[in-house]
């Protein structure tokens, strides 16, 4: 019996030691996660506390988001920093150093002037909850769910949101490997008598993977980075009593952006099941395009400039940029755009466009007039019926314009179809349609 009791004591000591070791490892990694937030420009952590337990621990801290960061994100001045309280429940076990640990977080707004307003929208000052799965090696899967908004005011507006979620996957160095956004529903309704309008958004699912992980400290910077993205939107409707209605159904988007030797290239495909403009409905929208030879450092400099513009002053967006120099840097890389397919339908009839454009041989420092010597462009347009019938009530003026375009040679009749081929002629510095008439003639009244 003594041997059994001794063995049990040894087992208990080993288990207790393992649990203690595991809880220490969890605390080390938890504190590393919190400390990394300070590396994000515009974030500051304070009042950090941690209560260690064997199988569960608690932690909390204040997260201050600077008004300068908010200004860059919102595009206008903000009166004060935002102060959030982040309260965490950390679950771990004896095998935490193998299996990792879970963090359940509650995020509350603390600003006195704001939290009562937030509570009127959300029912409390809790703006979001989060679940983090973290391994001791450092990998993290973070999922944030924003509190649903259910606000109605008969005099001003209605605001409703449901299941707005955001997620990040981080590697052991806290670099972002992927990001995702999900929205079940957002409904905004402006009840102002002078400008009644609605925005309805449903079924959003956006997933982006970064080919080269993005440093968490640079997550709010506007930079081109290699990625693969997919997105779906079930419904997007913009309803306005004055300006009319636009609705998109079943939108799908895929994009791939690559960078090699500071040159970027992208391939994008957009598909939309239906596009309704007032009472006119188009279906089967497809855009398949490619862009090549993008000067990534130059574009990033422009994006950096745009993100730091003081929109509340009269400062020009391009202040500090030499536009001739910037254009030269972009054009000397021989950029090109190719639209393999742009098409959509009205009933059974479709309109289709192909386009291929590029700048070749431009030298930095040349006059921008040299663009007209370096430009190549060609394309094709076809419509299964007349443009007047295709666009119908959306552009009734087309009934008068189309016959003139046909007689002048910009369009050709091909049975029931209307077609056109066009190509840029560098000698004439003009786009020639159907090898017959130039675009300049159109602007000069034929």
PLM regions: where:
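Positively charged n-region of N-terminal signal peptides that target proteins for export
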Residues: 1-4
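Glycine-rich, small/hydroxylated-residue low-complexity segments
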Residues: 6, 14, 20-446
């Amino acid at each position: 019996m003594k041997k059994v009791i001794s063995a049990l004591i040894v087992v208990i000591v080993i288990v207790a030691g393992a649990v203690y070791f595991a809880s220490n490892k969890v605390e080390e990694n938890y504190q590393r996660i919190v400390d990394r937030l300070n590396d994000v420009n515009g974030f500051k952590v304070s009042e950090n506390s941690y209560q260690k337990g064997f199988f569960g621990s608690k932690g909390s801290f204040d997260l201050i988001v600077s008004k300068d960061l908010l200004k860059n994100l919102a595009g206008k001045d903000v009166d004060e920093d935002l102060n959030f309280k982040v309260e965490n429940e950390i679950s771990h076990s004896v095998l935490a150093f193998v299996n990792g640990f879970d963090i359940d977080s509650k995020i509350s707004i603390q600003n006195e002037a704001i939290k009562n307003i937030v509570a009127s929208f959300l029912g409390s000052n809790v703006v979001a909850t989060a679940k983090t799965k973290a391994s001791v090696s450092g990998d993290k899967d973070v999922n944030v769910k924003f509190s649903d908004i259910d606000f109605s005011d008969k005099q001003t507006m209605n605001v409703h949101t449901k299941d707005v979620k955001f997620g990040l996957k981080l590697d052991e160095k806290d670099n972002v490997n992927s990001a995702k956004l999900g929205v079940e529903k957002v409904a905004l309704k402006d009840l102002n008598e002078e400008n009644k309008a609605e925005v309805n958004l449903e079924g959003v699912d956006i997933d982006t993977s970064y080919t080269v992980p993005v440093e968490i400290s640079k997550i709010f910077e506007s930079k081109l980075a290699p990625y693969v993205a997919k997105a779906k939107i079930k419904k997007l409707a913009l309803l306005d009593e004055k300006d009319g209605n636009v609705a998109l159904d079943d939108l799908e988007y895929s994009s791939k952006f690559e960078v090699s030797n500071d040159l970027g290239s992208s391939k994008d495909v957009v598909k939309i099941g239906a596009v309704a403009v007032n009472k006119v409905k188009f279906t089967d929208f497809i855009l398949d395009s490619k862009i090549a030879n993008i000067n990534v450092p130059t574009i990033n400099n422009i994006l950096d400039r745009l993100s730091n513009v003081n929109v509340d002053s009269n400062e020009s967006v391009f202040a500090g940029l030499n536009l001739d120099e910037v254009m030269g840097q972009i054009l000397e890389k021989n950029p090109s755009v190719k639209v393999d397919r742009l098409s959509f339908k009205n009933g059974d009839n479709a309109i289709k466009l192909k386009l291929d454009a590029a700048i070749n041989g431009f030298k930095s420092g040349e006059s921008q007039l040299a663009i007209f010597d370096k430009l190549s462009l060609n394309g094709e347009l076809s419509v299964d019926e007349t443009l007047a019938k295709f666009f119908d009530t959306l552009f009734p003026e087309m009934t008068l314009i189309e016959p003139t375009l046909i007689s002048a040679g910009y369009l050709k009749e091909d049975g029931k179809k209307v077609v056109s081929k066009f190509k840029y002629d560098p000698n004439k510095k003009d786009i020639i349609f159907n090898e017959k008439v130039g675009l300049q003639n159109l602007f000069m009244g034929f």
